[in-house]
């Protein structure tokens, strides 16, 4: 396995840029800018968070047993754990980057049920313990690129999705894999209130082609930094597809269904001209409202360390995944 490219800059995207983008998205969804201030007065918290103002996180999970295969270890500079678990997009708990850490403690992750169904010979159900015990866990240091043009490097812990799908034995009719987040509005304020949840339709849904899901890079993720995922990172199990934008990494998954037809996906339903089904990281295909040519790496530095670095095609994983898209127009199929 070839090591992935990375440029060593340490910087953080200005919050004013995030607020502007979020307001534009919400306006497109029919939500007034004034509504942003209705449920939360926390918009001013984010800059203070980056300046070192401690904000309590949901409790860290239990330590996990895992291996560290050499193929997935590298010398990329890691994003500190407080930023990995304190700077998140998880609209079910609010729009601000700090909201998930502040609000996700309400999510009950044990007991948990994950069902695999659809075009499979052997449907199956996993419980909470199965997620960390049924498959050997391994740590993988992956780049993570948000569609908002910021990035992290994270030591995720999990198992390849293809191992889970193999147990279910996909039939010849299976062409796609559909994923669904838990729907629990009593625990997730963004599912109760469209202003808190960004006006999205819930539960959150995502999808991959079957060959993407079966790729060895695609990870069912149950931990980070040596411990079980905290709720704000998508506990107890989330998807990581490192060559795609972060919104493809659906969190708190309760359903995986293999299908004949391409499944709907949440952000594509909300704004199809802005968020495609594939969502492959591509510096040559801009978002309609901002460039994807560069990104800001969230590292150990503060907001005064701001510098951009070039975005890499397929987030630096082109050697491993480019063949999946041979002959596909990546501008049309963004």
Curated annotation (Swiss-Prot):
Its cofactor is Mo-molybdopterin. Its main location: periplasm. PROSITE patterns: TAT. Binds 1 Mo-molybdopterin (Mo-MPT) cofactor per subunit. Keywords: Metal-binding, Molybdenum, Oxidoreductase, Periplasm, Signal. One of its GO terms (molecular function) is oxidoreductase activity, acting on a sulfur group of donors, quinone or similar compound as acceptor. The keyword Metal-binding applies. It catalyses: L-methionyl-[protein] + a quinone + H2O = L-methionyl-(S)-S-oxide-[protein] + a quinol; L-methionyl-[protein] + a quinone + H2O = L-methionyl-(R)-S-oxide-[protein] + a quinol. One of its GO terms (biological process) is protein repair. Pfam families: Oxidored_molyb (PF00174). Predicted to be exported by the Tat system. The position of the signal peptide cleavage has not been experimentally proven. One of its GO terms (cellular component) is periplasmic space. Belongs to the MsrP family. Part of the MsrPQ system that repairs oxidized periplasmic proteins containing methionine sulfoxide residues (Met-O), using respiratory chain electrons. Thus protects these proteins from oxidative-stress damage caused by reactive species of oxygen and chlorine generated by the host defense mechanisms. MsrPQ is essential for the maintenance of envelope integrity under bleach stress, rescuing a wide series of structurally unrelated periplasmic proteins from methionine oxidation, including the primary periplasmic chaperone SurA and the lipoprotein Pal. Heterodimer of a catalytic subunit (MsrP) and a heme-binding subunit (MsrQ). This is Protein-methionine-sulfoxide reductase catalytic subunit MsrP. It comes from Escherichia coli O9:H4 (strain HS).
